[in-house]
Structures are given as structure tokens and as C-alpha cells.
Regions:
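C-terminal alpha-helical "lid/dimerization" subdomain adjacent to the S-adenosyl-L-methionine
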Residues: 157-212, 216
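A short acidic, Gly/Pro-enriched loop at the edge of an enzyme's catalytic core
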Residues: 113-124
Length: 225
């Protein structure tokens, strides 16, 4: 699905959407998740830290929250953050400079489906809340597999529709009614905050996504739903 009702392809619409909402993105992200998104990212950092990487690629880095958190918690690690949206990257660069991490976190404009990263050159690839925005999910997963060193790891943090019927009903009410209303009011782009929960609904179920990862060449070792 696409964020807007235009003839542009999904990738261009996603780029445009995040360029529009970038100034309010962090504030809305933390507020609308009740700060839980920070806990999820910390969990990812703990997982990645145990892998003892030297070079990390953070795909769909956005405003850089995960990339900066990894650099902050892992000394000596180089983090490359890639994103389609220049405005999101501008926010990330501002934050990297503010916390003195602009030399260890390299932020670049780029496409997850055509990464300008050498084959077998990174130890870990992370993607936080980004794979469902790929224009071609299979192509993006194959690119991630291409840039990983032999034995490298990918850590993906993503939403899925709750399985518990009661929780699913509450989630549906919040994500499809309240989230677009609040997000649209603050960001001035209601369509963006209608797309975000709808994109979760349309994302492949965990079992299907795992099958896609296997098809792209990954061996799954840890799954938490």
C-alpha cells in the first residue's frame, strides 16, 4: 500500500511522507508509543551488543535513534545509517552532532533496495520499524544479505498485528482512530498517520515474513513475537 493517492510509486511516496513529518517525528513517535519505543530500541541494542560487532549498518535509520544508541553503548563500533529521507537524516545529523557522535555515526542518503555498501562488509545490519516501508521487501532483504559478512547477523524490529482478540481490538481502536487524529493534528499530515497503522495491517504475518527471510538466504536463530 502507499501513503498517498498519487501516481508515484511507494518508495517515492514514503520518501515524501517522511520528509513532511520529520520535524515532528521524534516527539510524536515517543508520545504516541507512550515512550515504549525507547524500551524496544534498548532491547535491540542489548542484542546487538552481545554480537560484538565492529561495523554496523542501520537501514531506514530515520532520525537516528537506534544508530546513536548503538554507538553510545558500544565503544569502538562504527555505525553507518542509511535512509531515503533527507529531512529525517537532517534530524539525525543534528542529534549526532549534539551528542558528539558525528564521527562514529556516518549518515547517508540511500535506498535499502540498492545499498551503496560493499559486499560482505558489515558485521550486523539493523532495521527498526522500516522493513514494512520497503518498496520491494524481497529486494531489500536480499540487499541486506549481500552486505553482511559470512556469519553476520540481521536484527529487525517491526510491528505486527496482535494475535490476542481483545488486545487486537484495543490496538485497532488506538492505531486506526486515535493515532491518526493526534498524529495528523500535530504533524499536519493525517494521511501519514493513517498509512503507518495500515502498513502494519498489510505487512506479512510473522510466519510469512520469516519464510521471506529464509528465501533471501537468512538462517533464523532468534524470533520474539
Amino acid at each position: 500500500m502507499k501513503p498517498y493517492d498519487t501516481e508515484q510509486d511507494k518508495k517515492e511516496q514514503v520518501r515524501e511522507m517522511f520528509d513532511r513529518i520529520a520535524p515532528a517525528y521524534d516527539r510524536l513517535n515517543h508520545t504516541l508509543s507512550f515512550q515504549i519505543d525507547k524500551l524496544w530500541r534498548r532491547h535491540v541494542v542489548r542484542i546487538v551488543r552481545r554480537m560484538q560487532p565492529r561495523r554496523i549498518l542501520d537501514v531506514a535509520t530515520g532520525t537516528g535513534d537506534l544508530a546513536l544508541a548503538m554507538a553510545r553503548r558500544m565503544r569502538g563500533v562504527q555505525v553507518l545509517g542509511v535512509d531515503l529521507s533527507e529531512n529525517m537524516l537532517a534530524e539525525a545529523r543534528r542529534k549526532a552532532t549534539a551528542c558528539g557522535l558525528d564521527e562514529r555515526v556516518v549518515l547517508s542518503l540511500g535506498d535499502a533496495e540498492r545499498l551503496e555498501v560493499a559486499d560482505a562488509s558489515v558485521d550486523v545490519v539493523t532495521v527498526a520499524f522500516g522493513v514494512r516501508n520497503f518498496g520491494d521487501l524481497g529486494a531489500g532483504l536480499r540487499e541486506i544479505a549481500r552486505v553482511l559478512k559470512p556469519g553476520g547477523k540481521v536484527v529487525i524490529l517491526e510491528f505486527s498485528t496482535p494475535r490476542n482478540p481483545l488486545f487486537r481490538r484495543v490496538y485497532g481502536l488506538y492505531s486506526h482512530r486515535l493515532l491518526p487524529a493526534i498524529g495528523g493534528m500535530i504533524s499536519k499530515d493525517r494521511k501519514a498517520y493513517e498509512y503507518l497503522p495500515a502498513s502494519v495491517d498489510e505487512f506479512p504475518a510473522p510466519e510469512c515474513f520469516m519464510a521471506m527471510m529464509r528465501e533471501a538466504g537468512f538462517k533464523l536463530s532468534l524470533i520474539h513475537i
